[in-house]
A protein has these predicted regions:
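Terminal cytosolic tails of multi-pass membrane transporters
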Residues: 431-507
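Short, non-helical or kinked segments that cap or interrupt transmembrane helices
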Residues: 59-60, 81-96, 144-152, 209-216, ...
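N-terminal signal-anchor module of multipass membrane proteins
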Residues: 2-87, 95-107
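Hydrophobic, membrane-embedded alpha-helices of multi-pass small-molecule transporters
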Residues: 22-34, 183-195, 212-213, 228, ...
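Juxtamembrane interface elements at the cytosolic ends of transmembrane helices
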Residues: 6, 39-43, 47, 193-204, ...
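Hydrophobic transmembrane alpha-helices of multi-pass solute/ion transporters
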Residues: 2, 9-10, 14-18, 197-200, ...
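Membrane-embedded alpha-helical modules
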Residues: 105-232, 342-456
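Membrane-embedded helical hairpins/re-entrant loop segments and their flanking transmembrane helices
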Residues: 21, 47-66, 70-85, 264-337
Length: 507
């Protein structure tokens, strides 16, 4: 049995405890503050980048909330083999944003109607989610193919690719490009204001203020935009009282080449879920080894896949387990899964009211851009941390250098591989897939040194320990019996060659 170590006292409320109503509600609201902005942002980004109508974008936002509520309910209640039985919160997966934009953008260039674009994107997501469900039964084998180096490269490429989307919104968005107002002083000033507010609150000593920094930054930016007359409320007119979820509202379409592209990201999301569920088990004082833990892992990943099936059918981008909430558990000392039931109900209720989804479409692009630039940059940094966490020898350097070279190269000129067959070109023209596929192939082909093989074997049995009381620097992992090397206070720096568990950080 693995052991966990905490600097502070035990949890106030353990996993199966039932806190009083008020404390349960406050705990739920605290978790919502940590995930709400990242939950609705992907739909807003995809809608803006593809020029989708306000009605469709708002529906995607509403369904994201409803699907997240359903997913959270399944995770915390653990029905048979489905769910982790932990306070695992589901939310929209940022990893799919660039893929959706690339696929939708290509279809838009071909003159395809927006509803058919949406139905294809959701159809691909629907089928791809079954990959996640199947992966829940072969987790040990999958982790040997998609190593920390591979997942780190993919996360790094995701962050770098998304920064372009963020900086476009920072300057006024795609609509400003069309109208010739891109990069105006008020756009840049508003984006910088939001950026500075987020940075300022993330420097706070209060964990709650740090976690709420993005939401506060958006509120300040929205208020200033309102005073400058930059907010258009026309989207809030003549709204129905309730949004009725309609399965496959825009139809069901499927594209095999698009499925191959999205499938790579789905496999990565499996390892994200593994890392997040492991962290949640640790802060909840549950075993992180043994049969019970393996049931939690497979159940959590199975729920991830099932919920993404449901989400895609309803009209939401794919979901995943969020890591931010582990910081909230650590901060509040409340690990009760009954808090998750409140979160689930609140999310579903919010999604049923169309005014909530429509409100987010009124946020000016520069306000969103100011938040997105720093959010996506942090995703890229998280990818770099994942890469170095497993040690960085000559072999890993070659894998990362080659993968980044091809991935970034494709982002600069996607036509470089246009001579390849259409099916292959569809995969490698996307920077994330080009970098990820290169990393997977090189990881399988390049021989490992004896020292590296020993490190990987040691990493099979890891001990996850708490490093800091800061919710934004929560965990690392080490081989059982190996000491951690730290430099002063705060999080220890990874030691080159030190074996650590495959884990994806989510910002």
């Amino acid at each position: 049995m693995s052991k966990t170590t905490r600097k502070h006292s035990d949890l106030i409320y353990e996993l199966e405890d039932k806190p009083p109503f008020y404390q349960t509600l406050m705990g739920a609201v605290t978790h919502l503050l940590a995930i709400f902005v990242p939950m609705v942002t992907p739909a807003l980004i995809v809608g803006g980048a593809l020029g989708l109508s306000t009605e469709i974008t708002a529906y995607l936002v509403s369904m994201a909330m409803i699907a997240s509520g359903i997913g959270t309910w399944l995770q915390v209640n653990r029905y048979g083999p489905i769910g982790s039985g932990l306070l695992s919160i589901q939310s929209v997966n940022f990893s799919f944003v660039t893929v959706m934009i690339a696929l939708g953008g290509a279809m838009k260039k071909d003159g395809i109607h927006e509803e058919l674009i949406v139905s294809t994107l959701l159809g691909v997501s629907f089928v791809g989610a079954f990959l996640v469900m199947g992966s829940s039964f072969v987790l040990p084998y999958l982790k040997r193919v998609i190593t920390p180096t591979v997942s780190g490269v993919v996360v790094l490429m995701i962050g770098l690719s998304l920064i372009k989307v963020g900086i476009i919104d920072f300057g006024g968005g795609f609509s400003a490009m069309s109208s010739g107002t891109f990069g105006k002083y008020e756009h840049i000033g508003l984006g910088l204001l939001v950026l500075c507010v987020i940075v300022a609150f993330n420097c706070s000593r209060s964990p709650l203020l740090r976690m709420s920094g993005i939401a506060i930054g958006l509120m300040v930016g929205y208020a200033v935009a309102l005073m400058l007359g930059m907010v258009d409320f026309s989207a809030l007119e003549n709204l129905p009282l309730i949004t009725v979820p309609i399965p496959f509202k825009y139809g069901f379409s499927f594209d095999f080449h698009a499925f191959m592209l999205a499938g790579t990201i789905y496999l990565l999301s499996v390892l994200e879920a593994v890392g997040d569920i492991t962290a949640t088990a640790m802060v909840s004082h549950r075993d992180i080894q043994g049969p019970e833990f393996q049931k939690r892992l497979s159940g959590g990943v199975l729920a991830d896949g099932l919920v993404s099936v449901i989400a895609s059918a309803l009209g939401s981008l794919p979901l995943t387990t969020f890591a931010q909430n582990n910081g909230v558990i650590q901060m509040t000392g409340v690990a009760s899964r009954h808090v998750g039931k409140f979160i689930a109900v609140i999310l579903v209720l919010l999604g049923l009211f169309p005014v909530v989804g429509r409100f987010f479409t009124t946020i000016p692009s520069p306000v969103m851009g100011g938040a997105m630039v720093i959010m996506f940059s942090m995703i890229a940094i998280a990818g770099g941390r994942i890469i170095i966490s497993h040690g960085f020898d000559r072999r890993e350097t070659l894998i990362v250098a080659t993968s980044l070279g091809l991935g970034l190269g494709v982002s600069y000129d996607p036509n470089v591989f246009k001579v390849l067959p259409a099916g292959i070109y569809m995969l490698v023209e996307n920077p994330i897939c080009a970098g990820g596929i290169t990393a997977i192939i090189m990881n399988l082909v390049l021989p490992q040194s004896r020292k590296r093989k020993a490190a990987v074997r040691d990493a099979e049995a890891v001990e996850v320990i708490q490093l800091s009381d800061k919710p934004d620097v929560i965990f690392t992992a080490r081989s059982a019996g190996q000491p951690l090397a730290s430099k002063g206070e705060g999080s220890p720096e990874p030691v080159p060659g030190q074996a650590v568990a495959p884990q994806v950080e989510r910002i």
